[in-house]
Regions:
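Active-site rim elements
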Residues: 1, 93-97, 116-127, 144-152, ...
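Substrate-binding rim/cap in mid-to-C-terminal beta-strand-loop elements of soluble/periplasmic
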Residues: 15, 50, 54-170, 216, ...
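Extracellular glycan-associated modules
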Residues: 259-468
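Metal-dependent active-site segment of extracytoplasmic phospho-/sulfohydrolases and closely related
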Residues: 5-43, 69, 85, 90, ...
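C-terminal, low-complexity/hydrophilic appendages and adjacent surface loops
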Residues: 86-106, 179-234, 240, 333, ...
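Loop/turn elements at helix/coil->beta-strand transitions in domains of secreted/extracellular proteins
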Residues: 22-28, 172-174, 189-192, 240
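Short, solvent-exposed loop/turn and secondary-structure capping segments
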Residues: 14, 25-27, 38-53, 119-120, ...
Length: 468
């Protein structure tokens, strides 16, 4: 599984350091994660991660029928909330909940034989990921640059951990650190931490709360004595809690944390990153466009659209992917099969598959291959897809349901001339196009009127509120 693969790759790096004689003078910093375990897999878990990311959840009975797929390349599974909570023990909460260590704390191992002589020993000093870069620079004897290419750099808040390499009892040089994600917030200061859970559990995406509401309660912990935040001391030391709350406010102002955002509430404002595409509805792509993130490609979901391509087939025929987006759990692909026959494949959550194929392979010469999709209207609804070759309709079929929000949050992309990720369709990995691709055009055809936008808005909201 994932852990075994990770261990094997780390071993390759360490073996290389040993083989090249660099191991003793190399500082290795191994951090076991980037946050707590994810509870986004919902109450029952998921066979297809894109399904719950789009607000669709498999029934427990269906999951049990497909239990043998878990951990294989047949699915993109995600464990359930209970496992996330267990994996974060002994801490409270999990990923997204930055107010508590279950959401933020990970183990870290350091190795540097030439400089760290107290091997196999534990360090209890409090530190944060922002202290990694200063530690590396200090170890290398370098100063943080004040300018880069003439551009003044922001000040560095991190501190080096080098002082602790050979002194397990040294006092921590990290005195204060704030935390905040989705309104879940905390402040650490000299052995104490004040924590405020904002109210939304991670497995319900869009249930928002106002700040300062009854669902919020600030808690207080002395982590020098209470590593796992198990004893709330807010009623015992109200003055200390008030002191830390004020400190959080000052740190939040200094570090641009305010205004706090609950992205599920309209009242918190629109903090979405502006689209690089603006209001464009049509874009042209070439084989130079591979590994393009989904957000940087024309969004054709929940709308009628057209995917057209101009290709040249060499003597003897061709095969391979013309263009695709997504992966084996959700996406679409326009390609020539191993017989050179134009084919369109639509994949919804790895479960609802539609393949539209022409009857004849393409002969050598120039051709235009187009898929025209007419959307029924509404959030994740279906529609009629028609495949055209050189302007002539060669086949059509209904796609009964479509992906409404996102094809992938796992690194799948838009590609022209190859499928760089997990194959969207029933073809080999990669499957490069063996002819010449001159152009691929994505065009969103239908104008989203007020009623359509309302259906989409309601669909997004309901998808985000579903927890199981």
């Amino acid at each position: 599984g994932f852990l075994a693969h990770t261990d094997a790759q780390i071993k390759r790096i360490l073996d290389c350091l040993n083989e090249t004689g660099c191991a003793d003078n190399t500082l290795v910093i191994y951090i076991t994660g980037d946050n707590g375990a994810s509870a986004e897999g919902t109450v029952h878990g998921a066979w297809s991660a894109p399904s719950f990311q789009n607000g669709v959840h498999e029934d427990p009975e269906w999951l049990l029928e497909h239990i043998d797929d878990f951990g294989t390349n047949k699915c993109e599974n995600h464990f359930n909330v209970g496992w996330a909570w267990a994996l974060d023990a002994p801490f409270q909460w999990m990923k997204q909940v930055a107010s508590h260590f279950g959401g933020t704390r990970n183990a870290m191992v350091m190795k540097w034989p030439d400089r760290i002589t107290e091997v196999n020993s534990v360090r209890n000093q409090f530190h944060h990921v922002i202290d990694i870069a200063p530690t590396i620079l200090a170890a290398a004897g370098l100063k943080w640059p004040e300018t880069v290419n003439g551009i003044e750099q922001m000040p560095v808040d991190g501190v080096s951990m080098e002082y602790s390499f050979n002194d397990a009892d040294a006092l921590s040089t990290r005195k204060t650190q704030y935390f905040e994600i989705f309104g879940n917030r905390a402040i650490f200061h000299e052995g104490w931490i004040a924590s405020c859970f904002h109210g939304r559990v991670p497995w319900i995406r869009l249930k928002g709360y106002e700040f300062g509401g009854d669902q919020e309660k600030w808690e207080l912990y002395n982590i020098d004595k209470d590593f796992s935040q198990s004893e709330d001391l807010s009623d015992t030391y109200p003055e200390k809690l008030s002191e830390l709350q004020n400190l959080f406010d000052s740190e939040a102002v200094k570090n641009n944390v305010f205004p706090l955002r609950d992205t599920s509430l309209r009242i918190s404002g629109n903090f979405r990153v502006p689209s690089a595409l603006g209001k464009r509805k049509r874009m042209s792509y070439t084989t130079a466009h591979v590994r393009i993130p989904e957000s940087a490609v024309i969004n054709i979901k929940n709308a009628s659209h057209r995917i057209s391509s101009k290709v040249t087939i060499p003597s003897g025929g061709a095969q391979g992917v013309i263009a695709c987006q997504g992966g084996n759990m959700s996406g679409w692909s326009l390609y020539l099969d191993n017989h050179g026959i134009p084919t369109y494949h639509y994949n919804c959550f790895g479960q609802y598959l539609t393949t539209i194929r022409a009857e004849d392979p393409l002969v050598d010469g120039d051709h235009e291959i187009t898929i025209d999709y007419q959307h029924d209207g509404g959030f994740g609804a279906g529609g009629l897809a028609t495949l055209y070759v050189d302007g002539e309709s060669v086949n059509s079929d209904r796609i009964e349901r479509t992906v409404p929000i996102i094809f992938s949050m796992s690194g799948e992309t838009f590609d022209v001339g190859i499928d760089t990720g997990a194959p969207v369709g029933p073809y080999p990995h990669g499957y490069p196009f063996s002819g010449e691709i001159h152009e691929v055009v994505l065009e969103r055809m239908s104008r989203r009127d007020r009623e359509t936008r309302k259906k989409m808005k309601d669909g997004f909201k309901q998808a985000g509120l579903r927890s199981q």
